[in-house]
Amino acid sequence: MLNADLKQQLKQLLELMEGNVEFVASLGSDEKSKELKELLTEISDMSPRLSLSEKSLKRTPSFSVNRPGEETGVTFAGIPLGHEFNSLVLAILQVSGRAPKEKQSIIDQIKNLEGSFHFETFISLTCQKCPDVVQALNLMSVINPNITHSMIDGAVFREESENIMAVPAVFLNGEEFGNGRMTIQDILSKLGSTADASEFENKEPYDVLIVGGGPASGSAAIYTARKGLRTGIVADRIGGQVNDTAGIENFITVKETTGSEFSSNLAAHIDQYDIDAMTGIRATDIEKTDEAIKVTLENGAVLESKTVIIATGAGWRKLNIPGEEQLINKGVAFCPHCDGPLFENKDVAVIGGGNSGVEAAIDLAGIVNHVTLFEFASELKADNVLQDRLRSLSNVDIKTNAKTTEVVGEDHVTGIRYEDMSTGEEHLLNLDGIFVQIGLLPNTSWLKDAVELNERGEIVIDRNNNTNVPGIFAAGDVTDQKNKQIIISMGAGANAALNAFDYIIRN
């Protein structure tokens, strides 16, 4: 089931195993069970440290990744290919005894959790957010014997996942725990275990502290580190919103990549420099004093720096119409690549006629029964090549001059109301899902009145990426720069870094 290149890469990774690992598989006579057995046999044959046995488990087909004679609590229900293949490889290495690449403070938090935690995560193999959650919970299961985790492919276990309309969907001890991307720190926080503020108390002041972890942040950090400045990053995750991007084909010199691969490469590049990257933590306040610029973190710790570059990016913009908020993850979705497979053979709408909306409609048309694309303006704003592709599809309708007014449904989406602005008539369209693609909302709510914002909530900057507060710079999608592109954000991050350096030597 694995191509030659992947088998060669896997063989090299399996050489890093430090102990024996046993696949314990629950298999039936169905086609998926045959595929799973083929995959596990193929992998087992690649290392003498791997073995395969069979046993009845809660779900079929599924398998656990165990040490000989010891259950680790790590289970995959379905066939972990696609984006989840890396989750399987990591699980093998970690169960074998390979040390995880996590801070000791995080490992200690996991070890100290008290109680029994049985996690189940519903995923789709096309979901780019899902592996982060699966890998975090697998690691927690390996570290703490009171934790178990099962990854469940919703496409294989359709009855169980029938009412799940957004992935990853995490359940703890049978109750809903969370939806969407979560870091290991997010999970620990939801369990009541937070990073100790004392970890940050003895940090020396920075020359440049960058808040955010996306392309602008990474670019800024590398530029300031290369200038010899003491540089820190405070971020939820390296890569930011790019992690949720499927394909990237307009980053010059890189013909094609994915958001996950881009973010991984960005993290690796940052690691090559003396940069203090503090991930899994968010800033909640910023204040300039006579002595320094102070950034307060969500755990109460305060970091000081001569300059700060704000690069917190942006998140999905919502419709802000009745019914939307209460039906998010219950039919209202924002990521077609993650959640699209959950709407197979169903009717959906895409809101937004820009590149993102049209690309989403094109992708969904290959999965769902029918797509209706709504655009508020009189014509679509997407590139012509995308519009031509969209109009060639037989299961897509396009409605322009359409103002969406209500998401309809009780416990899940059943329809959408919209107004035809050319006639003033209101309509109800019955459907099962709504994908909102109307742009981004800057992540500036934490700033309060610290720097000047425009009417859209974006940070106002000048050509040198200065804000209205000396020493505080901003770059990327969080600012009022007109065009929001990865390559533009990286240039803006570099520009902010060079001007922060200039500010330091002049002050």
Swiss-Prot record:
The active site is a redox-active disulfide bond. One of its GO terms (molecular function) is oxidoreductase activity, acting on a sulfur group of donors, NAD(P) as acceptor. The lineage of its organism: Bacteria, Bacillati, Bacillota, Bacilli, Bacillales. NAD(+) binds at residues 347-361. One of its GO terms (biological process) is response to reactive oxygen species. It holds the Pfam family Thioredoxin_3. Its cofactor is FAD. FAD binds at residues 207-222, 467-477. Gene3D superfamilies: 3.40.30.80, FAD/NAD(P)-binding domain. Binds 1 FAD per subunit. This is Alkyl hydroperoxide reductase subunit F. Its EC number is 1.8.1.-. Belongs to the class-II pyridine nucleotide-disulfide oxidoreductase family. It is an enzyme of class 1 (oxidoreductase). Keywords: Disulfide bond, FAD, Flavoprotein, NAD, NADP, Oxidoreductase, Redox-active center. Homodimer. It comes from the Bacteria. Disulfide bonds join 335-338. Serves to protect the cell against DNA damage by alkyl hydroperoxides. It can use either NADH or NADPH as electron donor for direct reduction of redox dyes or of alkyl hydroperoxides when combined with the AhpC protein. NCBIfam families: AhpF.
